[in-house]
């Protein structure tokens, strides 16, 4: 059973081309407290240095860092969104590594998500394991008025069936994206991304769990993002993935609600 905690706020600058420095979600497990001078903390610093240097070339990296005592071993993963450049990936991972040590400096189990990248480390080996426990949902509180709600549900479902099927193919490395015309003037844009350590089956399962929120928390809303440690799904009424159409991009200013998911 998941617990939902809802918060509403005014989002003044949710733009289609989010800067790497705009963090979306961070989680510091308070059951994994460590001291700043501990060997585990030093191993985390070493692990982050590896992730910062090695992730941008392929957009993904898993690694470990340990000393003589395996009890102090730390596992790490970093991944950039599959449609961004190596330069943007590098910037995002650097920012993530710096920020996570600031906000989770006393925890050995931490994760941080940006629009362009995701970074996680833990003393528990999470690599290759599906995780849809803790998560976060952002949605636009405005309802869809441009088309009939049932038609919107059908179009949204068809689009995400398509891009989910594309994402689980090995050649696409967990990324699926696409768009569909709702009216001559309104286009629905969608993107899915799972972490590349997952099997095709686990990736598909994560997407199914995340997309399920479209019919509940986000039902008939003009935009929604569902974030888990293992995957990320999003739709908007404006372009937000690359390559962008400069003529159609711009800010979406309005009231956004967030829902925190916990196991």
From Swiss-Prot:
Main subcellular localisation: secreted
Signal peptide extent: 1-20
Give the UniProt family note: Belongs to the cysteine-rich repeat secretory protein family.
Q: Which residues form the Gnk2-homologous domain?
A: 22-126, 132-240
The cross-references to InterPro entries, in alphabetical order and at most eight, read: CRR_secretory_protein, GNK2, GNK2_sf
Record keyword Nuclease present: no
User: Where does the record place it?
Assistant: Secreted
Q: What is this protein called?
A: Cysteine-rich repeat secretory protein 55
- One Pfam family this sequence matches: Stress-antifung
Organism, per UniProt? Arabidopsis thaliana (Mouse-ear cress)
One GO CC term, this protein: extracellular region
> What keywords were assigned to this record?
Repeat, Secreted, Signal
Domain of life where this protein originates: Eukaryota
Q: List the disulfide bonds.
A: none
């Amino acid at each position: 059973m998941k617990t939902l905690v809802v918060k509403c706020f005014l989002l003044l600058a949710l733009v289609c081309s989010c800067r790497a420095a705009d963090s979306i979600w961070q989680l510091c497990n308070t059951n994994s407290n460590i001291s700043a001078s501990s060997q585990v903390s030093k191993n985390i610093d070493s692990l982050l240095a590896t992730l910062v240097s090695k992730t941008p070339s392929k957009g993904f990296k898993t690694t470990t860092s340990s000393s003589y005592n395996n009890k102090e071993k730390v596992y790490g993963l970093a991944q950039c969104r599959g449609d961004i450049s190596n330069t943007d990936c590098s910037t995002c991972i650097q920012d993530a590594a710096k920020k996570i040590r600031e906000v989770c400096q006393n925890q050995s189990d931490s994760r941080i998500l940006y629009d362009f990248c995701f970074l996680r480390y833990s003393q528990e080996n999470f690599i290759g394991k599906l995780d849809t426990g803790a998560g976060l949902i952002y949605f636009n509180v405005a309802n869809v008025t441009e088309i009939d709600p049932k038609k919107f549900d059908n179009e949204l479902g068809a689009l995400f069936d398509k891009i989910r099927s594309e994402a689980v193919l090995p050649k696409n490395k967990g990324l699926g994206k696409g768009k569909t015309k709702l009216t001559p003037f309104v286009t629905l844009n969608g993107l899915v991304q799972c972490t590349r350590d997952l099997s095709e089956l686990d990736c598909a399962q994560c997407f199914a769990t995340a997309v399920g929120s479209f019919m509940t928390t986000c039902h008939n809303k003009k935009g929604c993002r569902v974030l888990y440690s293992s995957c990320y799904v999003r739709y908007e009424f404006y372009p937000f993935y690359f390559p962008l159409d400069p003529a159609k991009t711009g800010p979406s200013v309005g009231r956004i609600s967030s829902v925190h998911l916990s196991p």
